[in-house]
Design a protein with these regions (language model features):
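Short, structured "edge-of-domain" segments at secondary-structure transitions
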Residues: 1-191
């Protein structure tokens, strides 16, 4: 799997840096701005690294949002790809993982040691919080997967001076697989 580092700019553009192009850990490093061409006045706001099949919840402080896969945000251009439409005075909110795209793989534990694998199911709900202290949750199926980006749907109605503080995808349950007492396989569903 080839992972990509996505850089979300304050102008709504998404910049792609192949992880293999990042400097090694033993050097002095280099600023991310040497690997991408940011427009004048644009700041990198958020970063996300993952495989192409990962689905993210993208939102802006204006209260709009949508779902998108990393594969749709990729660009070979150093200037990035216009993907999230943000209005004047709005900011891009931190992306939230909806689905990893495939089940996590685990390696067997050495003999005599217990191993636990946590399976992350795709998110089932979205929680939105406004700067005015309001919270709204709804099922994630109400959102669109937008391959070309854009503004999206209204996530939460905002008061005139409020903004969207953030939106996060979550699941109401987690399934844990592991080795229990006596070396027997065990599975737990946490609601």
């Amino acid at each position: 799997t080839v992972d990509h580092l996505l850089v979300f700019g304050s102008n709504g553009r998404v910049y792609t840096v192949p992880v293999a192009n990042l400097p090694g850990a033993r050097g002095d490093g280099q600023p991310i701005t040497t690997l991408i061409d940011l427009d004048a006045g644009t700041q990198p706001l958020h970063y996300f690294a993952g495989a192409e099949a990962v689905t993210l919840l993208l939102s802006g402080s204006g209260g709009y949002g949508f779902l998108a896969r990393i594969e749709h945000m990729l660009s070979r251009q150093r200037g990035g790809k216009a993907f999230i439409t943000v209005g004047a005075g709005e900011q891009v909110c931190r992306p939230s993982v909806v689905a990893l795209g495939s089940e996590p793989k685990s390696t067997p534990a050495p003999s005599g040691q217990a191993q636990a694998v946590i399976s992350f199911a795709a998110a089932t709900h979205v929680a939105c919080a406004s700067t005015g202290g309001r919270i709204l949750t709804f099922e994630i199926g109400e959102l669109k997967l937008m391959e070309k980006g854009g503004r999206g749907l209204t996530l939460i109605d905002l008061e005139p001076k409020d903004t969207l503080a953030g939106a996060a995808a979550y699941t109401r349950s987690v399934r844990i697989f592991g080795i229990g007492r006596g070396g027997k396989a065990r599975e737990e569903q946490l609601e």
